[in-house]
A protein has these predicted regions:
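Bacterial N-terminal signal peptides that target proteins for export
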Residues: 1-8
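N-terminal signal peptide c-region/cleavage motif recognized by signal peptidases
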Residues: 13-15
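N-terminal helix-cap/turn-to-beta initiation motif at the start of protein domains
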Residues: 17-25
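Short coil-to-beta-strand transition motifs
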Residues: 20-21, 34, 99, 126-127
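Central antiparallel beta-sheet cores of small beta-barrel/beta-sandwich binding domains
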Residues: 28-105
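Low-complexity, intrinsically disordered Gly/Pro/Thr-rich segments
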Residues: 112-122
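Edge beta-strand at a domain terminus
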Residues: 121-134
């Protein structure tokens, strides 16, 4: 009887594990230095996902280098408008505070949902770069 209950519980929990999305806190990793930079909180608003910086790694100044007038990085919206389609997130924009440029964005869960591959690009996806957030 206990085995039957355990089996049923595992069977019912399986779809929940597969339904994991991108909502939550993600640690950004600088693709040039390999070091953590910030934590981005991704949340859903309607049918889109947006991300804002909620904390910074030690030693990272809380100022947006490209923002005019100057703004703090914490609270800055850096990811907007992603929409989920077949387990992938597309159609969004990502802001690079270092350059002040906004790029098209897409994202996809990787490594069993433990990391998020975020790609910023201009025009077509091959003209861009990918960061892996943890």
């Amino acid at each position: 009887m206990n085995k039957l209950i355990l089996s049923a519980a595992l069977l019912l929990a399986a779809p929940l594990a597969l339904a994991q999305g991108i909502e939550g806190k993600w640690r950004t990793i600088d693709d040039e230095s390999g070091k953590p930079k910030a934590v981005v909180q991704i949340s859903q608003s309607g049918n889109t996902f947006n991300g804002r910086i909620v904390s910074l790694a030690e030693g990272v100044k809380n100022e947006c280098p490209a923002c005019q007038p100057a703004k703090p990085l914490i609270g800055l919206n850096v990811l907007t408008g992603l929409q989920e389609k077949d387990g992938k997130y597309e159609g969004g924009k990502i802001y690079d505070p270092k350059s002040g440029k906004t790029y098209s964005a897409k994202a996809e869960l990787a490594n069993g949902g433990k990391s998020l591959k975020v790609r910023g690009f201009m025009g077509v996806s091959v003209l861009g770069r990918t960061q892996t957030w943890q």
